[in-house]
Amino acid sequence: MGSTGKIKIGINGFGRIGRLVARVALQRDDIELVAVNDPFISTESLTSLFKYDSVHGQWKKHEVKVKDEKTLLFGEKHVAVFGCRNPEEIPWGEVGAEYVVESTGVFTDKDKAAAHLKGGAKKVVISAPSKDAPMFVVGVNEHEYKSDLTIVSNASCTTNCLAPLAKVINDRFGIVEGLMTTVHSITATQKTVDGPSNKDWRGGRAAGFNIIPSSTGAAKAVGKVLPVLNGKLTGMCFRVPTQDVSVVDLTVKLEKSATYGEIKAAIKEESEGKLKGILGYTEDDVVSTDFIGDSRSSIFDAKAGIALNDNFVKLVSWYDNEWGYSSRVIDLIVHMDSTA
């Protein structure tokens, strides 16, 4: 924590998640954004992309302007701008950035992300799943974080939606096995028109014109943050032509018999208790755009789910895959700092 009493953070990669993490940070009193790094866009372009957002609207909290090529002004607040390609070259230490949000989508394993430490950062939070960095989902397993960990992953937006819901169901009723489908909005890696995609040919098709089946490791990743569910969940994804907000369909076989009403009551109770602000509950007749800007990880849609019988049920939960996830990145940093 800096001399201001705020946690000083830097952001590497000013894409969708990087910019929204910045927006979340700039609205909080306990976080100070001190630097951003992106070698692929100018400071002027970076400013425009931050200020105007097709999904989340114009930034109105304070004026954003370019002071010079290496400095942004958010109101009176100076934020350093770097353009380094390699993480080890970014001078985080010079600006006092203790925590770095690694949101390029490139440096997602421990060794690559650890390069930020050479520039003076103390901790790195990867805003993506990682094959070898410990993964934390706030509301599920963040209590397992130990202060000697320097590189961690905030998992994926879908895992952040699925894990709190799966935890409640497993804690209350037990999960024998389950399948997840996420109906997921467009992301930056998709194509605007049909084009080549070496590993995933379907993924190369036009994002705004197709429903695209895709793979996801989000359900299996729940087994990493909740080991009791390891091997019990898997899933797939449909990419659909919406700009933001996604929805998880979790179909599970229960150990203990429970009516759908009992399941709803359990989720509602947790959403108002230990998981308040993480897991939501609604009985309204909602659609996807109703959740744009919702900071919760997972909002259970009580009317959308259905039970076949007392041991086999389909549960539906919404999430703003951009804003909700970015909010958890900051929450994880705050938790890490509190255990330092």
From Swiss-Prot:
One of its GO terms (molecular function) is NADP binding. It catalyses: D-glyceraldehyde 3-phosphate + phosphate + NAD(+) = (2R)-3-phospho-glyceroyl phosphate + NADH + H(+). Keywords: Cytoplasm, Glycolysis, NAD, Oxidoreductase. InterPro entries: GlycerAld/Erythrose_P_DH, GlycerAld_3-P_DH_AS, GlycerAld_3-P_DH_cat, GlycerAld_3-P_DH_NAD(P)-bd, Glyceraldehyde-3-P_DH_1, NAD(P)-bd_dom_sf. Pathway: Carbohydrate degradation; glycolysis; pyruvate from D-glyceraldehyde 3-phosphate: step 1/5. Its main location: cytoplasm. Gene3D superfamilies: Dihydrodipicolinate Reductase, domain 2 (3.30.360.10), NAD(P)-binding Rossmann-like Domain (3.40.50.720). Signal peptide: none annotated. Pfam families: Gp_dh_C, Gp_dh_N. Its EC number is 1.2.1.12. The record marks 184 as: Activates thiol group during catalysis. NAD(+) binds at residues 16-17, 38, 85, 321. The active site is at residue 157. It is an enzyme of class 1 (oxidoreductase). PROSITE patterns: GAPDH. It comes from the Eukaryota. GO terms for cellular component: cytosol. It is found in: Cytoplasm. One of its GO terms (biological process) is glucose metabolic process. Key enzyme in glycolysis that catalyzes the first step of the pathway by converting D-glyceraldehyde 3-phosphate (G3P) into 3-phospho-D-glyceroyl phosphate. Essential for the maintenance of cellular ATP levels and carbohydrate metabolism. NCBIfam families: GAPDH-I. Homotetramer. Plants contain two types of GAPDH: cytosolic forms which participate in glycolysis and chloroplast forms which participate in photosynthesis. All the forms are encoded by distinct genes. This is Glyceraldehyde-3-phosphate dehydrogenase, cytosolic.
